[in-house]
Amino acid sequence: MPRGLQAELKQKIPFTSREAEAYLSLLRTADALQTQVEAKLKLFGLTGTQYNALRILRGAGPEGLPCREIGERMITRDPDITRLLDRLEDRGFVQRTRAKHDRRVIYGKITADGLKLLREMDVPLEKFGREMLRHVGQEKLKQLIELLELVRAGKAFHRRDAESAE
């Protein structure tokens, strides 16, 4: 009798390998989490990538970051940082300026309105994140973090980063 992911997917044939099962399990879990997070963010009028960019800029401090670096720090790579920042700038959450040392470099920085929005979101999203993973327990969460870091340390991730930099 199928169990776990095999049962969830109503798959009669077992997975061809543990790697295949783990890979599909990661994708399924990430999709489920992302769907719920996106619904929560929608209540604040943001997408996941917009929220990620705002958090990056908040963490960067008042000087902001070059647009290229914002793109490098994104959780989900967004090839069009310019358009992402356009949307956030149109809403008054981000401001862009040219670097004094090199006019070709554009910096993005979070505005007071962007900081205010994030402050409004902090408590509900922190609570939401805890609720989503509370059942796992602290020790298992620590193990999960270590396992995910191990997966990201693999060759395929370094190849992806190298390819996206080209």
Say what each PLM segment does.
Residues 1-44:
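N-terminal leader segment of winged-helix/HTH proteins
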Residues 23, 27, 31, 75, ...:
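Short amphipathic alpha-helical segments with heptad-repeat character
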Residues 27, 31, 35-77:
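N-terminal helix-turn-helix DNA-binding core of bacterial DNA-binding proteins
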Residues 48, 62-107:
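Canonical helix-turn-helix DNA-binding module
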Residues 55, 83, 146:
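DNA-binding alpha-helical recognition surfaces that contact promoter or target DNA
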Residues 86-146:
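Charged, amphipathic alpha-helical coiled-coil/dimerization segments
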Residues 159-166:
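Short, low-complexity, charge-dense intrinsically disordered segments
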